[in-house]
Curated annotation (Swiss-Prot):
UniProt name for this protein: Exodeoxyribonuclease 7 large subunit
Function: Bidirectionally degrades single-stranded DNA into large acid-insoluble oligonucleotides, which are then degraded further into small acid-soluble oligonucleotides.
Assembly notes: Heterooligomer composed of large and small subunits.
Localization of this protein: Cytoplasm
Family membership noted in the UniProt record: Belongs to the XseA family.
Organism, as annotated: Alcanivorax borkumensis (strain ATCC 700651 / DSM 11573 / NCIMB 13689 / SK2)
Pfam (any one): tRNA_anti_2
Taxonomic placement: Bacteria, Pseudomonadati, Pseudomonadota, Gammaproteobacteria, Oceanospirillales
C-alpha cells in the first residue's frame, strides 16, 4: 500500500490501484450464487451483468475468452452459480467480480449424479476400449437417431450429401430433450438394432445446458449403446459437452457434423486413392509383361525346331563324308608309296623272262591292290547312304509329310490322354500348318 500524508496525498488512480491490489490479494477465487440482471453482450464479445439476491447486488464481467466456453446462453432472471475473483475497476472505482466460470444453479447436483453414474458404469467395464468396434470404411446405409426437426439432423444430412451422396440415410426419430426423451431414444435404438438395416449409427443432438442434454446420461440408454451390435458414434452437443453415451459409444464426435464426417467416406479422397491404385496396377502389369516377354525371348532362343535339327544333322553328315574321303585318299597314297620301291627293284632286274614275269605280276598286283580299297569305299558309301536314309526317315518333317501330325499342350507334346482334361487348348502341327482346338471330352481307350 502506498504511504500518503498531507504533504504527499494519494491520487485517485493510486487509491483505486491500491484498493484493487488489496481486494485481489485478500480474496481467492470464490463461488457465488445469484440472479442475473442487466445482462448485456456488446460487440466486443465480453459480457456485463449484475448478480443479485434479495438484499444486495454486485456488478460482474465475463470476458470473451471465458464465456465462449459455456454450453448455455445466460438470460436475465436466471439463477446462476459462478466462480469469480473480486476486483476493482480502476477507471471508475467500481467494485465488481470477474467471472471465470458460470453454470445454471442446481447444475452441481446433476454433475455429481453424472459423475457417480459414470464411475459405476466404468467400474463394470462398460466403457472399456477392447469392446469398441471399428467403423466400416464404406457403409451401405447410415442410420441417424435424433430429432427429425433439430439443427443436428440438418447438419448431418448436409455433410453426408457433400461427402457421399450415393449412400442412403435412414432416420430413426426420437425426442432429444425432456422427460420422454430417454425412453424414445432407447426405443429408436432398439428399432435400429431389430431392423438391422444400417452398417453404422449416429446418436446425437445439438448443444444445450446440462439439463437439456440429460437424456443422453440415462443409464438404460448408455447400456443399450454399449451393447449395440452395430457400430455407433455419439455426437451430443458441442465439443465441450460430454454425455454417458459418448463414453459408451464406439466413437465420440465433438459435433453432429463431425460424426457425419467420421461415418462417411470422402469421395474425393476415395477417387485419389483409386487413381493411385490404378497407376500402381498399370506399373505392375507393365513390369510383369516385360518379365514374361524376356522369358519368352530367352526360351525361344533355346528352343530348337525340327528343321534346325535336320539341317544340323545334314551338316554333320557332310562333315563325316568329307572325313571319309580324306582317309581313303590318304590310304591310297600310302599304298602307292609302298608300290614305288617294288617298281624300282623290278627295273634293276635284266633277264627278259624275269622282266616279263615281274611285269605280269606287277600288272596283277596293280589290279588287285586297289580292290580292297574300292570295296571299303563302296561299303562306307553304302553305310553312309543307309544312315542318311534312316536320318531322313526319322525327321519329324518327313513324318508330317506322310500324313501324320504332332499335338502340343503348351510347349509339351501330347503322348497320352492322361495329360489332358476338358477345356484344354491344343495345337496340332501338320506338314503345311497348325490347328488350334479345345478339348471337349477325354475318353481313355479300353486296352483290356
Amino acid at each position: 500500500m502506498t504511504i500518503s500524508s498531507r504533504a504527499e496525498p494519494l491520487s485517485i488512480s493510486q487509491l483505486n490501484l491500491d484498493a484493487q491490489g488489496l481486494l485481489e490479494s485478500s480474496f481467492p477465487l470464490i463461488w457465488l450464487q445469484g440472479e442475473l440482471s442487466n445482462f448485456s453482450r456488446p460487440a466486443s464479445g465480453h459480457w456485463y451483468f449484475s448478480l443479485k439476491d434479495t438484499r444486495a447486488q454486485i456488478n460482474g464481467a465475463m470476458f470473451r475468452n471465458r464465456n465462449r466456453l459455456l454450453n448455455f446462453a445466460p438470460q436475465n432472471g436466471e439463477q446462476v452459480l459462478v466462480r469469480a475473483k473480486i476486483t476493482l475497476y480502476v477507471p471508475r472505482g467500481n467494485f465488481q467480480i470477474v467471472v471465470e466460470h458460470m453454470e445454471p444453479a442446481g447444475q452441481g447436483a446433476l454433475k455429481a449424479q453424472f459423475d457417480a453414474l459414470k464411475a459405476q458404469l466404468q467400474s463394470e467395464g462398460l466403457f472399456a476400449q477392447e469392446h469398441k468396434r471399428t467403423l466400416p470404411a464404406w457403409p451401405n446405409q447410415i442410420g441417424v437417431i435424433t430429432s427429425p426437426s433439430g439443427a443436428a439432423i440438418r447438419d448431418i444430412l448436409q455433410v453426408l450429401q457433400r461427402r457421399c451422396p450415393s449412400i442412403p440415410v435412414l432416420i430413426y426419430p426420437a425426442a432429444v430433450q425432456g422427460a420422454e426423451a430417454p425412453a424414445q431414444l432407447r426405443q429408436a435404438l432398439a428399432l435400429a438394432v431389430a431392423r438391422n438395416e444400417c452398417d453404422v449409427l449416429i446418436l446425437g443432438r445439438g448443444g444445450g445446458s446440462l439439463e437439456d442434454l440429460w437424456a443422453f446420461n440415462d443409464e438404460g440408454l448408455a447400456r443399450a449403446v454399449a451393447n449395440c451390435p452395430i457400430p455407433i458414434v455419439s455426437a451430443v452437443g458441442h465439443e465441450v459437452d460430454t454425455g454417458l453415451t459418448d463414453f459408451a459409444a464406439d466413437l465420440r464426435a465433438p459435433t453432429p457434423s463431425a460424426a457425419a464426417e467420421l461415418v462417411s467416406p470422402d469421395l474425393s479422397i476415395v477417387s485419389q486413392r483409386l487413381a493411385g491404385l490404378h497407376r500402381r496396377l498399370r506399373w505392375v502389369m507393365a513390369q510383369e509383361l516385360r518379365t514374361v516377354q524376356e522369358r519368352l525371348r530367352h526360351l525361344s532362343q533355346r528352343l530348337r525346331s525340327p528343321r534346325q535339327h535336320l539341317e544340323q544333322s545334314s551338316q554333320r553328315l557332310d562333315e563325316l563324308q568329307n572325313r571319309l574321303q580324306r582317309q581313303m585318299q590318304h590310304r591310297l597314297t600310302l599304298l602307292q608309296g609302298r608300290l614305288q620301291p617294288s617298281q624300282q627293284r623290278l627295273a634293276r632286274l635284266s633277264p627278259q623272262r624275269l622282266l616279263v614275269e615281274r611285269q605280269q605280276r606287277l600288272a596283277t598286283l596293280s589290279k588287285r591292290l586297289p580292290q580292297p580299297i574300292l570295296r571299303q569305299l563302296q561299303q562306307q558309301q553304302l553305310q553312309l547312304a543307309g544312315l542318311s536314309k534312316r536320318l531322313h526317315t526319322a525327321s519329324p518333317l518327313e513324318t508330317l509329310a506322310r500324313g501324320y501330325s504332332i499335338t502340343f499342350k503348351g510347349n509339351q507334346a501330347v503322348r497320352s490322354v492322361e495329360q489332358l482334361q476338358a477345356g484344354d487348348t491344343l495345337t496340332t502341327r501338320l506338314a503345311d500348318g497348325e490347328i488350334i482346338a479345345r478339348v471337349e471330352h477325354v475318353q481313355v481307350s479300353d486296352t483290356d
